[in-house]
Amino acid sequence: MASLRLFSTNHQSLLLPSSLSQKTLISSPRFVNNPSRRSPIRSVLQFNRKPELAGETPRIVVITSGKGGVGKTTTTANVGLSLARYGFSVVAIDADLGLRNLDLLLGLENRVNYTCVEVINGDCRLDQALVRDKRWSNFELLCISKPRSKLPMGFGGKALEWLVDALKTRPEGSPDFIIIDCPAGIDAGFITAITPANEAVLVTTPDITALRDADRVTGLLECDGIRDIKMIVNRVRTDMIKGEDMMSVLDVQEMLGLSLLGVIPEDSEVIRSTNRGFPLVLNKPPTLAGLAFEQAAWRLVEQDSMKAVMVEEEPKKRGFFSFFGG
C-alpha cells in the first residue's frame, strides 16, 4: 500500500516515529540519550543540543498567508515563543493594522501601552513600546497600532523598515529574529509588512481556496525580492486525507512548489490556548500540534525543511507525523 511520509531534508530527521502515540517518546537518536525507554511524550526542548543558527542576524521573517483564518497569528505566537525557548532573542511585530490579535494569543494584551505609531510620532521611545514576556525575557512584542485605530498618512513599508533598523541598532543589541505577523489579504497592509523582510513563512491549509491565495502571495513575495519562502501546512486531518476529503501534504507541496517547514495537525487545544493567552508550545504535557510548531521553529533556525515522498509499505498503525495519505 502506498502512503505519504515526511522526512527532514537533513539526514538526521526531526520527525516523530511512525509508532507515535501519547505514551511513546520521540526516539530520534540525535536528541534522546536512551531511545529504547518508554515515557510520556516529550517536548523537543528536552533534546540535548541547541539548534545552530544559520544565516546572518537578525533574521527578518514575515509570516503570511493571503487567506484569513488559516492560523497565521497562531503560528507567529508559537514559532516565536519556541525560538525564544531555544535561547534566541526574538521580537515579534504585529503588523495587522487596526485588527491586532497577537497580543491576545500571547496573553500580553493588558501590557501594551504604546505602539509603533507613538514611536514614529516621537511620543515614546522604542523600548517603551516593546512588551517583554514575563515567562521568557528574550521574547518581546511590538504592536504596529492600537485596535480599531488608523495609521497616520504616509505610514508604510519605509516606516516599518525604519523600526526594524532601530531594533538592529538598539543599545541592548540586535535580536536574533524579528518575526512579522502579516495581515491577511494583499492590500497596503501586506505590502507594508513584507517590505523589511528577507525571508517568509507561508501558512496555508489543505483546501483549494487557501491554496489559490497562497499561490498568489508567493508570486507577490518573489516580486518583492523575497526568494527564501517556506511553507507550513496547518490544520491537517489524516482521517479526511485517507477518506479523500482533504488534499494530502504531497498535493499541497506539488501545487505550491515550496519547501516544507512544518505540518500542523488539527488540534482542539488551539481554541483553549487562544482563549487563555497561553500558546500551545507552553502546554504540559505538550500536544502534537505544539510539538509540530516547535519542530518547525527548529527547522527555521537551521534553515532545514521537510520532504514529502510516496513509499510502498504493508498496512500498519501509523502516527500523525509519518502518515499523510493512503
Swiss-Prot record:
Mechanisms controlling activity: Stimulated ATPase activity by MINE1.
Disruption phenotype: Heterogeneous population of chloroplasts in mesophyll cells and petals, with normal and larger plastids, due to reduced chloroplast divisions and asymmetrically constricted chloroplasts. Contains highly elongated and multiple-arrayed chloroplasts in developing green tissues. Formation of some FtsZ rings that fail to initiate or progress the membrane constriction of developing chloroplasts. Normal shape and number of etioplasts in cotyledons.
GO MF annotations in UniProt: ATP binding; ATP hydrolysis activity; calcium-dependent ATPase activity; identical protein binding; protein homodimerization activity
Major localization class: plastid
Keywords noted in UniProt: ATP-binding, Chloroplast, Membrane, Nucleotide-binding, Plastid, Plastid inner membrane, Transit peptide
Effect of residue 296 to G: In arc11; loss of homodimerization, abnormal intraplastidic localization patterns, heterogeneous and reduced population of chloroplasts in mesophyll cells and petals, with normal and larger plastids, due to reduced chloroplast divisions and asymmetrically constricted chloroplasts, and highly elongated and multiple-arrayed chloroplasts in developing green tissues
pH dependence (UniProt free text): Optimum pH is 7.5-8. Active from pH 7 to 9.
Subcellular location: Plastid, Chloroplast inner membrane
Subunit structure: Homodimer. Interacts with MINE1. Binds to ARC3. Interacts with MCD1. Interacts with CDP1/PARC6.
Similarity field: Belongs to the ParA family. MinD subfamily.
Descriptive protein name: Septum site-determining protein minD homolog, chloroplastic
